[in-house]
Structure formats: structure tokens, C-alpha cells
């Protein structure tokens, strides 16, 4: 017999839930029957007493309930979570294939019905981030079957590193921290929080302790290959390079020269290390500079040294409140890149902000092209790699826009 407390939701929340969206906001709750604490599982019902689903409740977050199931018969025991993990692993093994499975995103939150949980596999290390209070409480039920499941594919994990050092955790009532996860079924001494991965036949040192997000951006894996195919014989400017991934893929594709730019000293140092690791010097050089200032300077000088520019900025907005400023920022860098490129040059441009929708991004690019007095010939329009699956009924899972253009 089920003993979960009952959350009754209004018609607006019911309509969203019926489309498959897993979130219930605080203002959409009509009443709660029975005792509960943040992080508990609760059953969600309509005002007509129809079962909607079961999820984690939170009295701190604006999202009051995050659904994890719509089956009233689920028991949420160890076997339930193991099935979820096995399904996630099997999906990645299928869509990524054996070669790309050793460094990919294994769990992508709501897209895998494990809200607020991110797990990235970097060779012999799992890097995790937990943003949902309820998932944080039961994470061992996820971590252990992940490690056991990976071993069946011949991947042996030496440690799990938690990157819970993000302020957004506080919105769910969680504290910030980072460090190795300790459990009796894991090695006692996992070693340094560094590892090496191979992506697209290129080696990278990954700083899982201090690198951005979980240490390496896996979502651009196949977009980098698209850049590599176009880079042969080109002089490439890679802006916001982070660890140099686009730059190194351009070099591997046959670029004559590549300049990788980032404002972060640590990012430039890591890029230099990756250049040396792959023997791409002197083809690739890393430069510490403010990309906005550099693009302004090159545009004013009418510099024609580059015939391929890559723009992969961090998210300029993480909320709808700052979208207008973000729009201007995206337009500024794209406009300047279009002014710098010669006719027939190539532009790869991205946005990783969910709030900057594809429609807005395309509108911004059209405005930038009009202002620059150029036309854009689209070569490819792409999204995140399939280990970051997009659920059409959960729009928040669709966030990465990537376009390749020829400027004509």
C-alpha cells in the first residue's frame, strides 16, 4: 500500500503534466494532504482525484514537485533506480557507439527521468552534479549501479567526483561543495582530480576539480567534427576556446593555422597543454585576450588574416530577465565576425543558453548579417550531441544551437 502524501494540482499544472512536462510550480499546488519533508516522494493528483505522477517535493524551490514516474505501481526501490540507470547506459551505448562511449554524458537530468542529476563519464572517472534535493538524498542508488553497469562494458571507474560547487544548488536548499564521493564499493584512493580523454582522436587533459562545469564540454563532440571537415586549408580564429577543443579539431582537419583565444589564463594554459599533448604546435597557438575587444580591433583594422571564425561563447544569459542584454552580446560578436571574414569565409556560431531559443538566435544572426552587409549561406544547423537527449515535451532539454555558414 502506498503511503506517500498527496499533492493536488490546479488545471494549469495538469495541462502541462499531461503534455509530459515533469515540473509542478508552487503556485500550481492546490493543497497537500499528509505530512511531508523536502526531498520526500509524493503522489500528484488532479482536483478530480486522478493520479498524475510521483515526484520529489521541495518547499524551498520554485519547482514544488519534480516528477520521476507516471506509473502508480512503481515502488522506487533499488531495482527501480537500477532500471533507470541501465536504460540510460544502454541508450548511450547505442547512440554513441563503442568508440565514443568512454567520454560522454551518461545522465542528463529530466531527459533520463532523474531530475537535477548530471553524470559525465571521462575515461575512468565519473563527474556528477546534483541540483535536486530529492535526487541528492538517493544518489547512491544511482552511483552504485552506474559503476557496476559500466564495468560490464569494460569501463572500470577509479572514482566519482562531485562538482556540487554551483550556486543554483542553494535554490533547492542544498549546500555547495566539491570533492571525491566516498563509498565502501569505490577505491579508497582515487588519485588526483585529473584524467585524460580521447575525443575525435584527440587527447585532452581534463581538470575535473576546477574546469568549467564538469571539466569538459561533451555536448559539442560532433559539432567539432563538422568544423574539422571544413577547416582544411583555412586560417582559423577560435573564440572562447576553453580547452582548445574546436581549435584542435580544426588543426586535425587540415587548417593551415589556428589561433585559440580565451580570457581565462587557466583556460589558455590548459589549451597549450593540449596542443603539446597532440603535437599541434606551431599550427595552433593559444592567446589570452578579451574576445569582444579582439574582435573589435580586428574589425576596425579590416583584418583579413582569418577565413574561418568559430564563436562558442559561454551562456550570456541563464534567465529570461537578462535575455535582452544577452541578445545584444550575441549580436555584437557575430556582427564583428561577419565584418572580419572575407567573402567566401566561414563562420561557426553557437549559443548554449536555453533562453536564447533557436528562433531568437536565427533572428539575431539575420540582423547581424543585414548590419554587416553580407548574406549567410547555411551549411549545417546542429544541436547538442545525442548523449544530451532532447525531449520534445521538456523544452528545457533543448538548449544548444550550432550553425555553420559561408559568408557571401
Regions found by a protein language model. Give the residues of each.
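Non-catalytic accessory regions of SAM-dependent methyltransferases
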Residues: 1-123
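Non-catalytic substrate-recognition/targeting regions of SAM-dependent transferases
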Residues: 107-120, 139-216
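Conserved class I S-adenosyl-L-methionine
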Residues: 233-242
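Conserved SAM-binding motif I beta-strand of class I
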Residues: 257-262
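S-adenosyl-L-methionine
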Residues: 266-310
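C-terminal catalytic and target-recognition region of SAM-dependent MTase-like enzymes
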Residues: 305, 332, 346-408
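Mobile active-site "lid"/loop adjacent to the S-adenosyl-L-methionine
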Residues: 306-336
Amino acid at each position: 500500500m502506498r503511503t506517500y502524501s498527496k499533492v493536488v494540482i490546479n488545471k494549469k499544472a495538469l495541462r502541462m503534466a499531461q503534455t509530459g512536462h515533469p515540473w509542478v510550480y508552487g503556485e500550481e499546488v492546490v493543497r497537500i494532504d499528509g505530512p511531508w519533508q523536502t526531498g520526500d516522494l509524493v503522489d500528484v493528483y488532479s482536483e478530480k482525484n486522478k493520479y498524475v505522477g510521483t515526484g520529489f517535493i521541495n518547499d524551498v524551490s520554485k519547482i514544488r514537485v519534480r516528477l520521476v514516474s507516471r506509473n502508480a505501481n512503481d515502488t522506487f526501490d533499488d531495482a527501480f533506480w537500477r532500471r533507470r540507470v541501465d536504460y540510460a547506459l544502454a541508450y548511450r551505448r547505442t547512440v554513441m557507439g563503442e568508440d565514443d562511449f568512454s567520454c560522454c554524458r551518461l545522465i542528463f537530468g529530466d531527459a533520463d527521468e532523474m531530475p537535477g542529476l548530471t553524470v559525465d563519464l571521462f575515461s575512468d572517472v565519473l563527474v556528477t552534479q546534483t541540483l535536486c534535493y530529492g535526487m541528492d538524498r538517493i544518489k547512491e542508488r544511482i552511483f552504485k549501479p552506474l559503476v557496476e553497469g559500466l564495468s560490464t562494458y569494460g569501463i572500470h571507474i577509479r572514482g566519482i567526483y562531485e562538482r556540487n560547487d554551483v550556486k543554483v544548488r542553494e535554490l533547492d536548499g542544498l549546500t555547495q561543495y566539491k570533492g571525491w564521493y566516498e563509498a565502501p564499493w569505490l577505491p579508497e584512493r582515487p588519485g588526483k582530480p585529473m584524467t585524460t580523454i580521447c575525443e575525435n582522436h584527440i587527447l585532452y587533459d581534463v581538470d575535473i576539480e576546477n574546469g568549467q562545469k564538469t571539466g569538459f564540454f561533451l555536448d559539442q563532440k560532433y559539432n567539432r567534427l563538422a568544423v574539422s571537415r571544413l577547416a582544411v586549408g583555412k586560417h582559423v580564429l577560435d573564440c572562447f576556446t576553453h580547452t582548445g577543443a574546436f581549435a584542435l579539431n580544426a588543426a586535425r582537419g587540415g587548417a593551415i593555422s589556428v589561433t585559440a583565444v580565451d580570457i581565462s589564463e587557466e583556460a589558455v594554459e590548459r589549451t597549450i597543454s593540449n596542443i603539446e599533448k597532440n603535437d599541434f604546435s606551431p599550427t595552433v597557438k593559444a592567446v589570452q585576450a578579451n574576445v569582444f575587444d579582439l574582435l573589435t580591433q580586428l574589425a576596425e583594422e579590416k583584418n583579413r588574416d582569418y577565413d574561418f571564425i568559430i564563436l562558442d561563447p559561454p551562456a550570456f544569459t541563464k534567465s529570461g530577465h537578462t535575455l535582452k542584454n544577452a541578445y545584444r552580446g550575441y549580436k555584437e560578436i557575430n556582427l564583428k565576425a561577419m565584418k572580419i571574414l572575407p567573402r567566401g569565409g566561414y563562420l561557426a556560431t553557437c549559443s548554449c543558453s536555453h533562453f536564447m531559443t533557436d528562433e531568437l538566435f536565427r533572428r539575431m544572426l539575420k540582423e547581424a548579417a543585414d548590419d554587416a552587409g553580407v548574406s549567410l549561406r547555411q551549411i549545417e544547423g546542429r544541436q547538442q550531441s545525442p548523449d544530451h537527449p532532447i525531449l520534445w515535451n521538456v523544452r528545457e532539454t533543448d538548449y544548444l544551437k550550432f550553425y555553420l555558414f559561408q559568408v557571401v
